[in-house]
A protein has these predicted regions:
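Bacterial N-terminal signal peptides
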Residues: 5-15
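Alpha/beta-hydrolase fold nucleophile elbow
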Residues: 204-216
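Glycine-rich nucleophile elbow surrounding the catalytic serine of serine-hydrolase chemistry
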Residues: 214-224
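Mobile cap/lid helix-loop segments that gate and shape the active-site cleft of serine hydrolases
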Residues: 234-282, 303-312, 317-324
Length: 331
């Protein structure tokens, strides 16, 4: 099957699927086993892109069982961009701004717009920060760690880059107990999809060339965004992930604060075998889009052997969809 036809199949299944709390999602006891899909009749091999699209729909539903349902995006409010500061750089203009995510919730961010595009459109990038009180300042080049200034670096390379604060970091005050979200992770996904909305609204951005990049917290937030928003064609994660059994040897407490996924504790008892999704599925669900991971050999949080196992498990899916080279990792 040609890739354009495959995109139509995937889109149809994802967009017509029932909400996570209504969908009867089959149980997948082994998230590492990707070349199967399940229904009421039992387990079936994944032999075609259509088979994989069924499993992929189950992956998104499983994530929403743990994170809460992705809010309806059919009646989004205007972004209402409000610029607070403008910095005139040598090769770009940097705007400090807020935009309306939903209700009265405004997201603080930086937006880099290259100069001298001469009417041409360029790629748009969502650059997501690590766990740091600096929040968006660090990727934007306003923190002391130059090796984490990836938002600034990409802007210098000629891309339009948006660098948001994650809720409760930087200038983004947020009360997770006062919203309607089941998890902070789903709120982050929604906000980051709104960042993509903003990029796509810019005349300088080619909406078919959207990427996401992040380090640590930003690394797995880039993967979460990439699963749910198929406008994101390239996902880059640095020191950002490993499967649940390899995260501190299966000790999942670090995932359970209000900022992240509390149901991992409250519903699934901190048991990685009970959580209805894992990174094997997330990485495979990017296909046929491109995924690049930078995974260090001695990361205490995101253990590298787990990364190796995920890459090996996901590779057959990329091969099935005709894009084996779109899955890349550097150790």
């Amino acid at each position: 099957m040609r890739v354009p036809t495959l995109w139509l199949v995937l889109l149809a299944i994802v967009t017509t699927a029932a909400p996570a709390d209504e969908l009867d999602v089959p149980d997948y006891p082994n998230h590492r086993q990707l070349m199967v899909w399940r229904d009421a009749a039992g387990e079936h091999p994944v032999k075609t892109p259509e088979d994989w699209a069924k499993r992929r729909a189950h992956i998104l539903a499983g994530m929403q069982q743990a994170m809460g349902k992705l809010p309806d995006r059919s009646n989004l409010p205007p972004l209402d961009v409000q610029i607070e500061e403008t910095f005139d750089g040598t090769t770009f203009t940097r705007y400090k701004l807020t935009f309306l995510a939903e209700g009265s919730d405004r997201v603080p961010c930086y937006l880099f717009v290259p100069k001298n595009l001469d009417g041409k459109r360029t790629a748009g990038i969502v650059a997501l920060h690590q766990t740091t009180p600096l929040g968006k300042q660090e990727p934007a080049g306003l923190g002391p760690s130059e090796n984490k200034h990836y938002g600034l670096e990409l802007a210098k390379r000629g891309y339009v880059v948006i660098v948001p604060d994650y809720p409760s970091f930087g200038e983004y005050e947020y009360d997770f107990n006062a919203d309607d979200y089941v998890s902070g992770s789903m709120k982050g996904i929604f906000n980051h999809m709104r960042c993509v909305d903003l990029l796509c609204s810019r005349p300088e951005v080619d909406p078919d060339r959207i990427g996401a990049i992040g380090h640590s917290l930003g690394g797995h937030n880039a993967t979460f965004l990439g699963v749910f928003d198929e406008r994101v064609k390239v996902i880059v994660s640095s020191c950002g992930w490993t499967p649940l059994h390899h995260y501190y040897n299966g000790d999942l407490k670090g995932w359970t604060s209000d900022r992240y996924v509390p149901l991992i504790r409250d519903k699934y008892g901190l048991d990685p075998d009970r959580v209805p999704f894992d990174m094997y599925e997330i990485v495979a669900a990017f296909a046929p889009r491109a995924f690049f991971s930078v995974s260090p050999l001695h990361d205490d949080n995101f253990e590298v052997e787990g990364v190796r196992q995920v890459i090996a498990a996901a590779a057959p899916i990329y091969k099935l969809l005709g894009v084996p080279d779109n899955l890349q990792v550097r150790y």
